[in-house]
């Protein structure tokens, strides 16, 4: 396995990512999409998305991790519509890579990253399959102005929103969540497969979101509710074991 630092350009912003490359290429690709930044989640034993990426690269997937705008070492301010453009920029880069099997590009998204993955896959046929973990089907930020202002203030203190004059329009920033966090996109993935995973103890996104999304999705589709798991499914061994097994079955079946 090799690791390479890579930068993507989106709306003039520089986004930082990493490629985890198996020995044998060209090969299928998995792009990991993180969720909205949150406070107080540091865990010295958590190897983060890099640790998760190694799990998939060892199974033969060229695995891509990156930070959406406003997050980690990437430039810009947090904006959910902007995240969809960021993912498109990453996919554009992947599609040009000689080490990638362009016919097998999968997304594994978590929470907001799952919503962005579904939205993007609904409009981008280059994506062959999606795994959506702890995915919301609606957002309180789309309707609650006071909550949106609180989140923006928190993100400003965290450095996720860096510019004092951002967002230029609070209403448009909120409307982005109404557009992206929606069950109206998921049926457009068919006949490409989707796997929905949710924890039954998720206190951030209700498990009812998973069932609603599953109901709206076209075939082929699968759903898994992990007993005892909370919102952070990335650190659930059971959830990620099932995600890897499902992805392998969908990717290497032929």
Role assignments for model-derived ranges:
Residues 51-73:
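Conserved alpha/beta-hydrolase
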Residues 15, 124-212, 217-225, 229-230, ...:
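The alpha/beta-hydrolase serine catalytic core
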Residues 37, 68-72, 137, 230:
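Alpha/beta-hydrolase active-site loop signature
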Residues 23-55:
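Short, surface-exposed "cap/lid" segments of acyl-processing enzymes
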Residues 44-48, 69-102:
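Catalytic nucleophile-loop/oxyanion-hole region of alpha/beta-hydrolase
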């Amino acid at each position: 396995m090799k690791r390479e630092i890579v930068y993507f350009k989106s709306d003039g912003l520089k986004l930082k990512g990493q490629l985890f490359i198996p020995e044998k290429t060209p090969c299928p690709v998995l792009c990991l999409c993180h969720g909205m930044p949150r406070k107080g989640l540091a865990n010295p034993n958590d190897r983060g998305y890099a640790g998760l990426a190694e799990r998939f690269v060892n199974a033969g997937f060229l695995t891509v991790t990156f930070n959406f705008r406003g997050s980690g070492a990437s430039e810009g301010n947090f904006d959910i519509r902007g995240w969809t453009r960021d993912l498109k920029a990453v996919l554009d880069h992947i599609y040009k890579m000689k080490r990638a099997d362009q016919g097998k590009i999968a997304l594994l998204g978590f929470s907001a990253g799952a919503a962005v993955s579904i939205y993007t896959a609904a409009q981008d046929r280059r994506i062959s399959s999606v795994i959506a973990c702890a995915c919301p089907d609606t957002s309180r930020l789309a309707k609650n102005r006071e909550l949106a202002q609180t989140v923006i203030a928190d993100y400003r203190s965290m450095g996720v929103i860096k510019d004092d004059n951002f967002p230029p329009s609070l209403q448009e920033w909120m409307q982005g969540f109404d557009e992206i966090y929606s069950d109206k996109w998921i049926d457009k993935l068919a006949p490409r497969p989707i796997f929905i995973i949710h924890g039954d103890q998720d206190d951030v996104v209700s498990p009812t979101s998973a069932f609603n999304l599953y109901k709206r999705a076209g075939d082929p589709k699968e759903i898994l509710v992990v007993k005892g798991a909370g919102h952070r499914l990335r650190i659930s061994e059971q959830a990620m074991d099932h995600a890897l097994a499902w992805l392998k079955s969908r990717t290497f079946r032929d």
